[in-house]
Design a protein with these regions (language model features):
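Catalytic core and acceptor-binding pocket of nucleotide-sugar-dependent glycosyltransferases
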Residues: 117-218
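N-terminal anchoring/stem segment of glycosyltransferases
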Residues: 1-60, 183-184, 206-240
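Short catalytic/ligand-binding loop motif for oxyanion handling, primarily in non-cytosolic enzymes
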Residues: 13-15, 43-46, 92-97, 101-103, ...
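A conserved donor-nucleotide-binding helix/loop in the catalytic core
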Residues: 16-25, 56-87
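Short acidic donor-binding/metal-coordinating loop in glycosyltransferase active sites
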Residues: 39, 87-91
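Short coil/turn segments at beta-strand junctions that form active-site/ligand-binding loops
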Residues: 2, 32, 80-83, 89
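Conserved donor-nucleotide/metal-binding helix-loop-beta segment in metal-dependent transferases, i.e.
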Residues: 94-128
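Non-transmembrane alpha-helical segments in soluble domains
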Residues: 23, 27, 92, 174-178
Length: 241
């Protein structure tokens, strides 16, 4: 079975309450070992059930850059199954599935570049996106795409294109991986990211097996926390007693 890898920031908000429910939700998907790439494990994690990878980000590295380096590390270190499952701490599997997926949906990368440029100006993340777009085009892909993914992401580690790297970075390695391995990407489906009560109702009504919380601190206010408490009242093997 495929191993699961979480790439976690440190510290986690609210001592990792979202991660706890994400781990409990893994019972709905067949999987191998669970790896966590992070400087420190939360103190409530059972260290005997989780493989801890002490990947230390550069001091003061921004979140996107830290995650990019972890993706690059994923493609160069053979410590887990080659076919792995990428998880974030706010991905929840709310009903049984046979495997992770589908692969992420997308929008053109230039849309994201324009959004960040308008919002932040000429900052490092914008330059990294521009570098990423340039590199993808140099590889013969006319319209670089940006993955939109808020559910378990199947990834073949040996297909992460670390050989693409030149000396003109930094890059977003998650975007590079997506473009390298998706010659015929899927169409955009409904969103499953919850930001408020009404969206939560719509997601549940569609019968999606996955849920994800927003990045704006509305985890409790959205009603998702209360729902997960009802769905997963019992601790998983990955939590201390």
């Amino acid at each position: 079975m495929n191993d699961i890898v979480y790439m976690l920031k440190d510290p986690l908000p609210d001592n990792g309450v979202e991660l706890g429910y994400s781990l409990r939700s893994l019972k709905h998907m067949p999987h191998g070992k669970v790896f966590m790439v992070t400087p420190r494990l939360p103190d409530w994690i059972n260290p005997y059930k989780v493989e801890h990878i002490h990947h230390l980000p550069t001091h003061q590295m921004q979140k996107w850059a830290d995650l990019g380096e972890k993706w690059k590390w994923l493609g160069t270190n053979d410590v887990m199954t080659d076919e792995a499952i990428y998880m974030d701490d706010d991905y929840f599997i709310v009903r049984p599935v046979k495997k992770a997926g589908p692969r992420p949906t997308f929008h053109p990368l230039w849309v994201l570049i324009e959004y960040y440029t308008e919002k932040y100006g000429d900052v490092e993340i914008v330059r990294a996106m521009q570098n990423t777009e340039r590199l993808i085009k140099e590889k013969g892909i006319e319209i670089p795409l940006c993955p939109v993914q808020h559910y378990p992401w199947p990834v073949v580690r040996s297909n992460i294109p670390v050989h693409w790297e030149d000396d003109k970075g930094p890059y977003d390695w998650k975007i590079l991986e997506f473009n390298h391995n998706n010659p015929n990407p899927p169409e955009y489906p409904h969103e499953n990211k919850v930001t408020d009560h009404e969206q939560l109702k719509r997601v549940i009504a569609r019968g999606t097996p996955y849920l994800s919380s927003a990045d704006d601190g509305s985890f409790v206010d959205s009603g998702l926390l209360s729902l997960l408490e009802q769905m997963f009242p019992e601790k998983s093997e990955y939590e201390r007693d």
